[in-house]
Amino acid sequence: MKMFKPLTATLFIIVTLVYAGYSQANISALGDLSKYRGFNYTPAGAVSPHHHIDQWVKYSAAVTNFDLDLAKRLNLNQVRVFVPYEAYLAIKDTLKDRLRHFVQACHIRGIGVMVVVGKGPWVQDTSQRPRAIEWVKFLSAALSSRPGLAMWDIMNEPDYPEKPLERVQRNFENCRFMSRLFREIDPKTPITIGMAFEKNMETLADYVDVLQFHDYSDTREKIDQTILRAKQFAAKAGKPVIDGEIGCIARANPYDVTLEEHMKAHVGWYIWELMIVRKGWGAVHGVFYEDGTVRDPSIAAAILGFFRNRNDILPAIVDREGAITRVIDDGNGWLAQQDADWKKGLDIAETAANLLEAGELAPMHVPPTWEVAQLRRGQPDVHALQNLIKKYLQALAPFKKPAEK
């Protein structure tokens, strides 16, 4: 058996530890990750498919500050933000200051920052790895000493899609390489990998300090099962675990449902995403429009821990005081007039719309009050108003109290 000399043996141990995933990261600085209330962030005005690049190339401190104030109002305390390598290539001279402003703006609001490191040409061509080294050195020099930086996410969803397998294996090898690289260049900042699937989170567990999975399951049972598996593996691995992406109305993963299950399970989470990005994922994701209004108030309520009662409910009786009966009578009377007053018709429509929304008697995909507001803003269109009132009266009719005998 060949014997190692003392120095050779020491170097062998060091190299082995690093390559096996040994970490010196300051995990304790992250605090209790079960209390993480996070969000993925892209400005509402970013444009797909290069929205994560444009976020930095067209960086606006004013927009950032406004959006982060919205997050603070919801008591959110973590953010996950993408920094593509292409942004570095585009604005190498100014990117550092923009990153620092973002992290500082988050820090003063009590929001920790997870930076998702964009992939580069080295993923497919390992001869390009010197560019990855340059990239990681840049990021570390820019942010590692800054208060507010929580962790590096070294690759987003390397396991999605799951086919072809060769692609996934290549991505996993990149994750191992980037993990070793970050641990060499910035050993104190924790590392995570945003895995699309919990099962794959387990595969690269040795290369992270914080386990991370994403979940958009379409039933509570599936959500709970995924969380349970993640927690069980995390306990076995002795590492904290978070869910880095939740919430998508197009995947039957309502924000209020998934948030409630994660809160009950005491697992930290990051919603996708804070802003409604009109030319990105905004049709199926997001809490706030660019002006600070919301599409669905139940999402904001759920983030604050207030959930819909789905057990012992008390259905609303909207016509308890005759409001539905009156607006139906008023509406039919207005419709019967030859020269009906435009403003009176709008008032009838608005009253009907308010009853529909307040009693949750109408779908909110297009809010009835929005339809009325559109008519108020435009030129008088009697035919459109007549059709709207007819639609509202028809929707209200089933909820009219029967006449007393």
Model region roles, listed by residue range:
Residues A141-S144, G148, P158-V277, W281-A302:
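Extracellular glycoside hydrolase catalytic/binding regions
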Residues V81-P84, G118-D125, W135-R167:
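Active-site groove signature of glycoside hydrolases
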Residues A9-V18:
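Bacterial N-terminal signal peptides
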Residues D319-E371, L396-K405:
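Amphipathic, heptad-repeat alpha-helical segments
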Residues S23-Q78, T192:
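N-terminal carbohydrate-binding accessory modules
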